[in-house]
């Protein structure tokens, strides 16, 4: 009988099914995650990503020394363009 690979995906699912082998000994096999588990996993990962982005963003701002209004405006526009991936029209 084939064993499932031990991956972060299979480790992240807590649901287990118990199957009987042909010789009668029970084995545990990770089941497929249901929709609620998938959404929970997705939201946890995205929350971690957002926290990392916010931390990196504020570290950049705090590292600026005596910023002028123009330099801040330029910086904000660059960030805006990167996040939206659209051409800037002035």
UniProtKB/Swiss-Prot annotation:
Which cysteines form disulfides? Answer: none
Q: Please name the Pfam families in this protein's record.
A: PB1-F2 (PF11986)
Give residue spans, biased composition: Basic and acidic residues.
1-23
Q: Does this entry carry the keyword DNA damage?
A: no
Question: One GO cellular component from the entry?
Answer: host cell cytosol
Entry keyword annotation includes Membrane: yes
Which positions does the site annotation Low pathogenicity cover?
66
Stored InterPro entries: Flu_proapoptotic_PB1-F2
UniProt region (Disordered), positions on chain: 1-33
Question: Other remarks?
Answer: Is not encoded in all strains, and seems to be dispensable for replication.
Described purpose of this protein according to its UniProt entry: Plays an important role in promoting lung pathology in both primary viral infection and secondary bacterial infection. Promotes alteration of mitochondrial morphology, dissipation of mitochondrial membrane potential, and cell death. Alternatively, inhibits the production of interferon in the infected cell at the level of host mitochondrial antiviral signaling MAVS. Its level of expression differs greatly depending on which cell type is infected, in a manner that is independent of the levels of expression of other viral proteins. Monocytic cells are more affected than epithelial cells.
Indicate what this protein is called per its UniProt record: Protein PB1-F2
Q: Give the species.
A: Influenza A virus (strain A/Turkey/Minnesota/501/1978 H6N8)
Instruction: Tell me what gene encodes this.
Output: PB1
């Amino acid at each position: 009988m084939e064993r499932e690979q031990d991956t972060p995906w299979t480790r992240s699912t807590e649901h287990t099914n118990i199957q009987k082998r042909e010789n009668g000994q029970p084995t545990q096999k990770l089941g497929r995650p249901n929709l609620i588990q998938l959404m929970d996993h997705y939201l946890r990962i995205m929350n971690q990503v957002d926290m990392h982005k916010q931390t990196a963003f504020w570290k950049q701002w705090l590292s600026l020394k005596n910023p002028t209004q123009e330099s801040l405006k330029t910086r904000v526009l660059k960030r805006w363009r990167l996040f939206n991936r659209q051409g800037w029209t002035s």
